Amino acid sequence: MPHTLNKNIDFFIAALSQTYISALQLDPDGMYAEVASGIVEQFSDEQVRLRRYDGSVSHYARDNTKFQRNKG
């Protein structure tokens, strides 16, 4: 079952544990779609920086992106 990351402590734990998380944004139909997944490299109250599988880096705003990790 997915766990949504909301608080700074959630992102801190994900970064320390090097857990892959998914970044989801609303599509035109109003459904959440995955736009990226990766490891949290840096975060602030405004944005999260993810390092993807291929090594590229992307930034996502926390106010319009939902972040989830899957519980195993």
Spans of features found by a protein language model:
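Short glycine-rich, low-complexity segments
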Residues: M1-A33, D54-G72
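Beta-strand secondary-structure signal
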Residues: Y20-S22, S37, R49
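Short beta-strand-centered aromatic/proline hotspots
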Residues: E34-E41
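Basic/aromatic-rich interaction segments and small domains that mediate binding to polyanionic partners
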Residues: E41-Y60
